[in-house]
């Protein structure tokens, strides 16, 4: 699941997009062929997952509850089908089968997330480390490596330990920074000899906007007038506070990893830890030398009209979604538009914090799914403060009754492959062309329980979606975007947060009523052919 980004499109860019769209088809109206060989040597292809959506075994193996366990059980009406991730798709027990599927498809890598409360059941070191959790992830990592699949490990994918939510309100408290860093260090120590790509946080935009502004995702906090009609929360302040603490936790953890575990040549030259502890070059080079980054999600937003107000609105939406995180990571502070419009509700970085956050990544993960239109929407006099209105922009999937692209199963999902290209080029031109991995990209279909299995496996819309987005990605790379890998969402059908099991994102079908049996969809067969070396 992913969300938005925005920038102005001039007439020249529109012509370029039209040319790209037309060039995507040959004279017969077919998409041009594409395969692994179309991409540079060493380009990584994989699939992604997350612990709560995939693992199941929610109360097994010593795992403590997360905020998603609490949210789905206390507020089942906030989930479309009133379901939860207690069983998910049972990857906790079926991980070997899942790795076999990846290997047979020809995938190079697998991005999974580690459940914080499976490692530290009460969220902090004081409650002890759960060795069963350590053993599970060791087994998963070893199984991946035995099948020549690279592990990409995400440390946080929306699932704050409930114990920390109870103790000090989770990411609303700066206390979580040290607890998160302690948890991350356990993972570096236990798995870092084999995991060479680490992600600190997945989609902080989703976590903070949906969890603290709209209240439609855990922990389900918002102002009473917002969509989630929450019992507690402040949609005008809490989203900014939570994400401020995530950025600080990210930066602290990146510094920890670089100084104690990574030891690249640059770190060896610059690190006071190495110098102060008299670590010589030989011992430093023998350590992990992995890479660490963060995953951001963004839509592409097209101005609703050619007016200046529409163009400015599109820029603001981008600032409030992608720039919220990229600006601090590149420039050390939030975008000017956010500082002006949010005012004192937006936390400030100290000089030391600004320097720490700036440049705190080896790569950026980008999750892209869909695009929308953006138009100017100034607030009315005396309006209530909320992140959802602070950008003074209105977002819509249609213009004059015509959608920006075909609508997928989810209400927010308008398919627009060109948006991936434009988003990548925007990052290239505005943020110094960092190393990027596309860490999620995919499309959902309705979970039609009356459909026969044979028909459910015919997901031609998904094949077309991947084909067009890979063409868009290749076009951006040819124009200089620094992309090193692509991960499809997702390997399997799974629990899709507030939509429960009502939609299916998998390239492999999961039969939830028959032992979680996996079946390859047509898109899985397409990927296998695409990935053939």
From Swiss-Prot:
Pfam name, any one: Glyco_hydro_1
GO biological process: carbohydrate metabolic process
Active site per database record: 203 (proton donor), 440 (nucleophile)
Gene3D superfamilies (UniProt xref): Glycosidases
Reaction(s) this enzyme catalyzes, per UniProt: Hydrolysis of terminal, non-reducing beta-D-glucosyl residues with release of beta-D-glucose
Glycosylation sites: 122, 384, 448
Residues that bind a beta-D-glucoside: 53, 157, 202-203, 369, 440, 489, 496-497, 505
Disulfide bond annotation, renumbered to this chain: 222-230
EC number: 3.2.1.21
SUPFAM superfamilies assigned: (Trans)glycosidases
Keywords from the UniProt entry: Disulfide bond, Glycoprotein, Glycosidase, Hydrolase, Signal
Keyword Flavoprotein: no
Signal peptide region: 1-23
Gene Ontology MF terms: beta-D-fucosidase activity; beta-galactosidase activity; beta-glucosidase activity
PANTHER family (UniProt xref): BETA-GLUCOSIDASE 9-RELATED, GLYCOSYL HYDROLASE
Protein name: Beta-glucosidase 10
